[in-house]
């Protein structure tokens, strides 16, 4: 899979931009605060209908305007797709091949992406919510039903929490009705996550072993707030534990267990990776990203698009080399950087773009080499 071109209207500091890409490597060079990250964010947004930097769509709108449009042409093994996202004060519209998509799960997955940004280094030591977000984005791209189940779960969870917060005399019969719905959706969310972690664990360990020069093994554990013995019993255990938590939940006025409380833990040679060195943690994240690429390819039969946002300067020469070696020739890759100094040997099939104050131009020197 690769994105052939993109058109931006009123996105961040871009009033208008139209860019044609190389199917292989695309490098965007410019000083800081010129729009390099904004541009990669637009590709990410076109794929996932969300930013990795903000929850507010208003922040994406150019200060002179009130609406945004991002369009792109994607080439997949199954054919060409036209993607279109429009944001306005009335809301958002998503289209595939000019047809409106009623549900998010109908749109997500049309173009798959893997993003590696400096903030990903917080995946090891950061808040559990970062790791849940990591799971939700990856699983959502390869399992469209997951997003619907997660949305339904969050809807019932909000109902349950609102009821607990606003009701003085809680009706446990009504609470049990909500428990049934929460267990239905939540057990499927946990099952999807559990399966994904098992597959990710195997693939990431292969990469980490190579990157660490065969000195370290990586393992990933899913930490569920629900105790269960096997996948077939998740719903039953979830429901029982929800019932047992009624008194605590009524007292605290929120739902104390469920996938919204779950986490993942990383281990390097059986030691919690939070105690690892910065270099070990960077190798871990690099292994995760390379594993994501392979998992998406396995499920969808198409390689995802790789977005590397200002991370090459965060990696030493060894890890840069392993990253570039790990990227298959048919993985379209986008790199942002302030210079080419810290990039290892580059392939011939690439395009280099200059980015300056919301304007993108082809690097003519490279184009004529």
UniProtKB/Swiss-Prot annotation:
Localization annotation: Cytoplasm
Residues spanning the signal sequence: none
Superkingdom to which the source organism belongs: Bacteria
Annotated keywords: ATP-binding, Cytoplasm, DNA damage, DNA repair, DNA replication, DNA-binding, Nucleotide-binding, SOS response
GO cellular component, one term: cytoplasm
GO function terms (MF aspect): ATP binding; single-stranded DNA binding
GO biological process, one term: DNA replication
Broad class of where this protein is predominantly found: cytoplasm
Residues at which ATP binds: 30-37
InterPro entries assigned to the protein according to its UniProt record, in alphabetical order: DNA-binding_RecF (IPR001238), DNA-binding_RecF_CS (IPR018078), P-loop_NTPase (IPR027417), RecF/RecN/SMC_N (IPR003395), RecF_2 (IPR042174)
UniProt-listed Gene3D superfamilies: P-loop containing nucleotide triphosphate hydrolases, RecF/RecN/SMC, N-terminal domain
Keyword hit for Cytoplasm: yes
Task performed by this protein: The RecF protein is involved in DNA metabolism; it is required for DNA replication and normal SOS inducibility. RecF binds preferentially to single-stranded, linear DNA. It also seems to bind ATP.
NCBIfam families, sorted: recf
Family: Belongs to the RecF family.
Protein name in the entry: DNA replication and repair protein RecF
Record organism: Streptococcus agalactiae serotype Ia (strain ATCC 27591 / A909 / CDC SS700)
